[in-house]
Amino acid sequence: FLPAIAGVAAKFLPKIFCAISKKC
């Protein structure tokens, strides 16, 4: 369960950070 959350976070956090910071 926890590794799945970590995998999803690792997949989506960069995209969210990219969208917020506008640094892609």
Swiss-Prot record:
Expressed by the skin glands. One of its GO terms (cellular component) is extracellular region. Keywords: Amphibian defense peptide, Antibiotic, Antimicrobial, Disulfide bond, Fungicide, Secreted. One of its GO terms (biological process) is defense response to bacterium. It is found in: Secreted. Pfam families: Antimicrobial_1. This is Brevinin-1Bd. Its main location: secreted. Antibacterial activity against Gram-positive bacterium S.aureus and Gram-negative bacterium E.coli. Has activity against C.albicans. Belongs to the frog skin active peptide (FSAP) family. Brevinin subfamily. Disulfide bonds join C18-C24.
